[in-house]
Amino acid sequence: MATRRLPAVTQTDGSRTATESGVPEYEDQIRSYRNDQRRRHIWAGRGRRLLSIMPGVSSSERTLEMQMNPEVQLQRSMNHRAEAVPAEVLYRTFHGSVNHRVYSHRSEERMMVVNGSQVDRSFIQESSFEVLSRTGIEFIHIGVMLVRIQILHRKFAGTMALIVFRDTRWSDDRAVLAAMEIDLSEGNQIVYVLPDIMMTIKSFYRHIQICVMTKGYDGWQGEDNLLITRGLTGRLSNTSNVGFAYDVKAMVEHLQSNGVKAIKGEKWDAKRFHNGQWNIEPSKVVVPMQPTEMKAVSNYDGTTSLRFSNYAAASTSKPPQYNEKDEEINEDEQEINHSLNLILNDEESTDEDEEYYQYQRYAWSQVGDSTFYYDTDGVWEEIDRCNDLPEYVPSETSTPTIDESEAIIDEFLEHAYEQRCDSDESLQSGDPRKYEYPTPQSSPEHLDNESRSRSSSASSTSMQDDVEEIVRLMKEMRMKKQKKKKAQQALSSQAQEEPIIEENIEENKQAQEEPTQEEIPTHKENQPEEIQNEEIHVFEEEPAFKHLAAQLSELVNMAESSGQSGVGFQPPVNAQPDVNMEGPAGYAPATSQATWSNGVNIPVKSANFRWKGPVGNFQLPSAQGKDGAMLVFGMNYSPEVFDRWASITRNYISSFNFNDGGDKIAWMEDLLGETERKIFVSWRMRFKDEYQNLAKIANQDGGTQAILSQIRRIFLGEDPVLGQNTVQNIAFRKLKQLVCPNYQSIRRYLMDYLTLAAETGLMWSETEGPAISEELFTKMPAAIGERVAQAYKIMDPTSAVNLPSRVYFTINYLTEQCKEASYMRSLKALDFCRDFPIEGYYGRSGEKKKYTARKATKYTGKAHDNHIRVTKAKYQRKCKCYICGQEGHYANQCRNKHKDQQRVAILQSLDLKENEEVVSADDKEEEDDEIFSVLGEEDYQEETIMVLEEDDIQQIIKEFSKFGDLSRRNVGPNFPGPAEVQMGVLKPKSSWRRPIQATLEEINCHHNWTAISTGQLACRSCKQFLAGVQCHHCHAVYCFMCAEAYHDVQAEKILSKDYSFSARGKKGKAVIIEEDEIEGEFLISQLQQENQRLQKQVERLQEELMKLHREKDEALKHSEKASRVFSTIQESDEAELNLIKEELRQFKEETRMAIAQLKEAIIVQEEDTIEERCAMILEEKHTENIYSATAKAEYNGLYNVKVGIKPDNMEPYYINAIVDTGATACLIQISAIPENYYEDAKVTVNFRSVLGIGTSTQMIKAGRILIGEQYFRMPVTYVMNMGLSPGIQMIIGCSFIRSLEGGLRIEKDIITFYKLVTSIETSRTTQVANSIEELELSEDEYLNIAASVETPSFLDQEFARKNKDLLKEMKEMKYIGENPMEFWKNNKIKCKLNIINPDIKIMGRPIKHVTPGDEEAMTRQINLLLQMKVIRPSESKHRSTAFIVRSGTEIDPITGKEKKGKERMVFNYKLLNENTESDQYSLPGINTIISKVGRSKIYSKFDLKSGFWQVAMEEESVPWTAFLAGNKLYEWLVMPFGLKNAPAIFQRKMDNVFKGTEKFIAVYIDDILVFSETAEQHSQHLYTMLQLCKENGLILSPTKMKIGTPEIDFLGASLGCTKIKLQPHIISKICDFSDEKLATPEGMRSWLGILSYARNYIQDIGKLVQPLRQKMAPTGDKRMNPETWKMVRQIKEKVKNLPDLQLPPKDSFIIIETDGCMTGWGAVCKWKMSKHDPRSTERICAYASGSFNPIKSTIDAEIQAAIHGLDKFKIYYLDKKELIIRSDCEAIIKFYNKTNENKPSRVRWLTFSDFLTGLGITVTFEHIDGKHNGLADALSRMINFIVEKNDESPYRFTSSVEDALKVCNDDHGRNLISAVINDIITVLRR
């Protein structure tokens, strides 16, 4: 037996083993600080620094991360315990162990944490808190915390966990100390946290918690799945300085490793949870609290109520324990029941520590079922007591000698920095060695030396000092050990004389339960030396102990399990993850899981079933109190009985106060019936602990509900308030099975359905709620259910979840049906009608039948199907039934089942007299006067336009009154009047409320709410006179509930800024009266002012009357003179009158002669036309001319349409689409739409087609789609890579057609959608990509036109004189020259071809026949291109065709004359363009540019030298540009002309170059225009432009620039002096275009393209060219007839005489005149300086026109003309505040000036109204009378004449002119018409 000295260790409660989930095994240790261990840690560091300077030894710094090696700890945790950082490493040495202690904690707990759940735990347990409280220390410092997670299932299961360390003292995200997401694939992980926090012990226990959540446990059906280990090292202190010695740079250090691998199975990864989101719920850890304040209240019955407050954390006290002598055991003397899991990890630990750890191993062996020993690595390891504990061999002494101590010190100095593997080898060597544990002491010198050593450097001087210090300290230690040796020897000798006591198992157990003083180590400071040196008895345990302990543990578990209550008190829990049961008492909804089922089918024969009503007629007996009731179930043992009793009891008990919870439960116990009370009392006696828990919270908030819930669980086994849903699931199953089979049970079915739905708790659920509401109708009998559902949808179309509303509506609907049935039954016999004559009854003529009988006129003895014989009723003749063919009865008496149903339908709809009958008509009827024919009536509906007159205003007021009272209080200055009311729908926030109708002004109003008191005004929604709010702007009135529901107005906010209702009280009416008085005074003042004005006017008229009297008197005086003068005047007037009549007669005669000549000319012209047509047929021949190689639109024979994709809050994006009724869904090419327009689809969709199977994972975002001129809801459109034909980018399939819920009609190229009655025009060719829409030109056509005119350079002399330096610098710069490749290296944008199918080989057809001239020209062009290094020889597999054309014009540099037939080399890239994705970058609007630059004063224009060649080709795209020229193949190094994406790429480049200079630089492809107001500004702007060109490598053409000119030609227009006109070369191109070219489709298309430049200068140009454009259609007539040539000549004549247009100034007023007919529309934009200026000052600035296909009605044409005109002229009026629109359509004027409600065609008016509203400016409409619109009317008739092609057109034109002459009464109109007639005659003669 050996005797040892024990260290000073204070141990607390022993370890506790978890017997069930959620009960942790925990260990704590509170001990003194080991100063010697700190010294060894410091010495080891100094030794390492000393070794680092020695030669041959590598320098290495040992950090805290190295000491906490995560790889080793994670692998060690599979066999031993993972270790944390020793306290002696984290903290510095302190004097006085009373104020400082080291605290270590370790606990393990198994738990089940699955998806949707969150587990919160305090970091330490309640028992640990009690131990810390008994130490008397105030503060704790948290040094390091660790959490280890071990999974309790297979590895690689694809699971993940979240660990959150948090401080719940914070209420926001600052509560999170650290968090880590852990992948559990390898099985276990460790998380270390160093928070460096100091707090009180109470705060530490209450607020430092961990939160655990998991993912990937879907389908987990086991119990516990995780084992959580927690460890802590901290310092307890009563001072503010805890000596934390580690520099924490980061709050959390997460050290992870791969862990241990196992046998491979099917691996699941956790990648699907990466970047996921964790939702942390509030902590649910319950910490015992105790009050600190009390308040006493005396009750009315003499009792006293006590109320406690200001609760704080409380340490619960355990019941006292007694020993064998019946003496109470002090807690401070109890044996420790749990130990520390965080042990020093110091590989340099000396043998002196082994004595302490040997003692620890023995001490723990006496405590619990397991033993812990400290191995050579410093790890606590748990081993089995009887098998793994080494046998103790007693020795005489365990204290080493002085020589041994010196040897140890020398060994330490020599091997101070050994590797960790040496320690591992010593671990395997056998039993640990035994050394004396020295008494820890500290001195100031040691602390000072320690401080010096920590701050010393690595120099040689400091190292020498360290060595001296180490030697001195070791000498001190050697002297101390010599003094202790003698005391140890004396203790050993005394221990040898005492016998060894062998103890049995019971004695061991008793020793464990009642530890003696000899077995409990205490602090050295408080014990004498002889007690510290007491004996330690070590014995070997008996082998049977383990078996007996297991049996004893099993018995204890059985006893504990039998003592648990199956209906114990439970707090509310979340039965479902998405159901929150916190707050007031709730009701958990049902789940979708299956509940119990009967499982047995009982045969039903003749059982007497009864209907169970939703409300039982049971009554509970009185409790003989005021209002209480007794709970007696009786025969009605159902939850309804308990719910009723609970409601009564809850209200009854709310008026009483109780001293404690026990009294409250006892009082409620007396409310139970006899049997029920016995049941409850037996439960209370059996489960006392649960009853005590219930009593603790019974008198708190929610205590009454807790008692009721417990009683319900006792009697019914569940409670929905606690989140349990057994009853709800049963009700949900019954609800799904409930069906109403017949009409008689509808009322009871409704009650059952409502009751069961309420019991499920899912009535208002977002998932199940809509289905429950809709199934109410579907489970009713089919006929009545569908009708009720349709009626409810009409009444409330938006409410998706509101079952009570549907039940109430169904009851009212069926009640009305019963009333109607009763009424119809009472009117079954109408015999009384003969005694009551009525007005307005004119017989049966108004009740038209579908068929009528007319006397047959073509009956020849052969009876047809429509022939009948009508005879008198009761005619005594043999007759044949009309509907069955049998003889002997009439049709109305026929009972034959085999009837002709067609004849039955005819007979029912046949209009006959009362005494007539119908019989069959046979062949060869003798009395043919009775034979009649049945005629059917065609239904038609004539569209009318209804305009509300003044008489309809009262009806509008009546209709509007149901949405709100139109009292003077509600109608304010901003409220629309009766004729202006426009209604809309105001939707509530909640889905169960109905939307209400409100004015558009109220919906769009920015409300300013003010509170009003009760009884003042009625609410707009509920019509109640309640307290609410009123808006100052729109005067809308709502109660507080409706205001919150419809306008999100909070009552608290309104009341906080308004005075209270009690303060207003009686002032409400006074306010109204005061406002009435103010308004009355205002009216009186207005009347007085008007009266004064009238009085002044009367005085002025009286003065004028007096003046007239005076003049009359003077006139009478000169009467004689006047008579003489009068005769002379009369003669002269008669002569002048005769002269005027003669002139008028001559004018009419000339007009008649002109008309006659016109008729003759028309007849002659028609004869010439016939001859020309014959000649064209006889002399027709084939000619072939090549003008250009422009790619035409691809003909595919499909329904092509251009659509706009417009997601919400985004601009529309236009693409080409086809309407395909054979496609199932809508698809779009992924390369045709920007990425931000589509999103990831919820599911992956597979599509099957003839090309194979395709997959889509993206879809277009929600929004709208623009088809034609109508927006539709965006259908579900999937985005994928499709192999579509060239030009097609989208397929509109049946999913869009089905979503319309209407019809679809296809007629030729017109598609009509019947939901919104929208017609769109399609084409059989694809839309040309990147076409210039304003000019209707392709890019190549535009470039050809622009290149055909040589623009000579121009330099203004005055500008050159002022800017001589700038021009000199321009000449010296090389970026103005002939070489476009000069600065090619500065090119920042390259041309890359996005090829659709890279496998396609481009094989252009070579030219077979080449003339020598073309071959020579091509060789010359190729050599020039090779010299410029823009092309190179190619070896590409692709091949396009190049050829020479001679078109366009050029200027001879010698003669200066224009030379036609300029040779150009053209490349046919048609096949390449078809295989290239389109670039959707749009070109800027020409009209927008012109309107922006037109008002400037000085211009400069530049063209790029071969602009496209200044863009380099991507190297990978170069082979695709290969072309065949002659017999050789070449490829482009620059972007060539002819690529369809070239203009878009070049425009993007130019926009990027000149970005930010839009205010003075306009760019359109390669044209650059600089515009300024002054010459000084222009110089600065030119310098900026030239610098940008130099930076980006742009080369300007020296021969095509104009600088400093006041007029400029740009984009086909001549600008200058605020005027705009068509360029002369455009006019010459249009007028000089040869007829031979016009006769070909290519020539006509080119001519129409050039004519597009003039569309803004010619009125109604769209109507004129419509017949010509029809010839360009694939199915149009390509031949030119005389009418066509007339139109061409007329257009050329108009182009020659184009007027100059004048751009409006900035402050001008804009007027737009519009006109529309069935085939087209036209608009004119005018301006004047002020709105009130006369019309004579108006100037024209633009024209616009277009055609309609298909034709439109008159009203639609006028509306569309106004809409198109406003759209075309936006650039002129968007910056204005007001606008005038003139139209000759009176219906539009009345519509806009009155209202657009109740129109027969709502779509047209709503579209028109929406367009005007969206302008954002004030629009005023004016009507143009016919007498002021003579020219427009004549032009319209002329256009109609040109378009018409029938034989009656000349005569109708003549009559039109005559009608125009009749309406024009003034000279101006007659002159205009005469001029028009002369022009027409001139055209016809040509």
UniProtKB/Swiss-Prot annotation:
Domain annotation Reverse transcriptase: ranges: 1425-1615
Comp. bias regions, Polar residues: 9-20
Keywords: Aspartyl protease, Endonuclease, Hydrolase, Magnesium, Metal-binding, Nuclease, Nucleotidyltransferase, Protease, RNA-directed DNA polymerase, Transferase, Transport, Viral movement protein, Viral penetration into host nucleus, Virus entry into host cell, Zinc, Zinc-finger
EC number(s) stated in the UniProt entry for this protein: 3.4.23.-, 2.7.7.49, 3.1.26.4
Gene3D superfamilies: 3.30.70.270, HIV Type 1 Reverse Transcriptase, subunit A, domain 1, Ribonuclease H-like superfamily/Ribonuclease H
Modification after translation: Polyprotein P3 is presumably proteolytically cleaved into several chains by viral protease.
Zinc-finger ranges (CCHC-type): 879-896
SMART domains: ZnF_C2HC (SM00343)
An annotated Gene Ontology molecular function: aspartic-type endopeptidase activity
Biological processes per GO annotation: proteolysis; symbiont entry into host cell; transport of virus in host, cell to cell; viral penetration into host nucleus
CDD domains found in the cross-reference section: RT_LTR
Catalytic activity entry: Endonucleolytic cleavage to 5'-phosphomonoester; DNA(n) + a 2'-deoxyribonucleoside 5'-triphosphate = DNA(n+1) + diphosphate
Binding site for Mg(2+) 2: D1715, D1833
Ranges for region Disordered: 1-24, 420-466, 478-529
Entries under InterPro entries matching the protein: Aspartic_peptidase_AS, DNA/RNA_pol_sf, Peptidase_A2_cat, Retropepsins, Rev_trsase/Diguanyl_cyclase, RNaseH_domain, RNaseH_sf, RT_dom
GO cellular component, one term: host cell
Residues annotated as domain Peptidase A2: 1215-1292
Job description of the protein: Capsid protein self assembles to form a bacilliform capsid about 90-900 nm in length. The capsid encapsulates the genomic dsDNA. Following virus entry into host cell, provides nuclear import of the viral genome. Virus particles do not enter the nucleus, but are targeted to the nuclear membrane through the interaction with host importins.
Protein name: Polyprotein P3
Gene source species: Commelina yellow mottle virus
